Amino acid sequence: MKKDKDIEYKSRLLETSKDKAKKETMMDSEIEVINFDTIKDSYVQLFKIEKINSNDALIIRDDEYLFIEFKNGKIRDIKDVFEIYSKIYDSLIILSNILEKTLIELKDRVSYILVFNKELEHTRKFERAEEGFIKHLNKNSEIERIYFGLRKFEKYCFKKVYTYSVEEFKSKFLQSLKENNDISLLEEFEDKFLKFLEKNNND
């Protein structure tokens, strides 16, 4: 097994968006991000805890953090939705411990994007529920749609929550990320995580 310092915690969106079961990737992009699955694996190994879940990627901008979860499979029922929720909670706890910040302190600095495969036609009931919610609020069509019951996490756990199809993610977010991705911030986070591992390995 590799030593922690030999593990690469940065990877490309091409890799973090990969569906290992289907052996396909949702995002053909060379942009570098923090591979939060790898962070989680080292965290689990350090504390010798039961397997936990995590979001796929972490992006860092200035003093703000953005989790990205890629969901290529079907989101059919409460079990699938609960898995997404579990990844959110576990990832926030891991990030909180690494940064030595409470969840309250992080709430206004962390946002979340779920990228899903709209072609699978598994979102209809969630879309209907969201449209009903917006209609109930008597809001116009410009309000941001947030599917899969994730709206409740906005202002509760995250500063902002977004749910995008692959094409929406590319058009609304990817170009901005290409222009503003600061690799040095990813490297700083890697260093911080390595220090976290070293400190807790000695306790």
Question: Predicted segments — roles?
Answer:
Residues 1-51, 193-203:
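Basic, amphipathic N-terminal segments that precede the first structured/catalytic domain
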Residues 72-122, 142, 149:
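Catalytic cores of nucleic-acid endonucleases
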Residues 33-35, 72, 170-178, 182, ...:
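Intrinsically disordered, low-complexity segments enriched in glycine/proline and serine/threonine
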Residues 57-59, 64-72, 91:
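Conserved catalytic cores of phosphodiester-cleaving nucleases, focusing on short active-site segments
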Residues 106, 110-190:
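Short, low-complexity, polybasic intrinsically disordered segments
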Residues 19, 28, 63, 71-73, ...:
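Intrinsic-disorder/low-complexity loop/linker signature
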Residues 54:
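Phosphate-binding glycine-rich loops of NTP-binding sites
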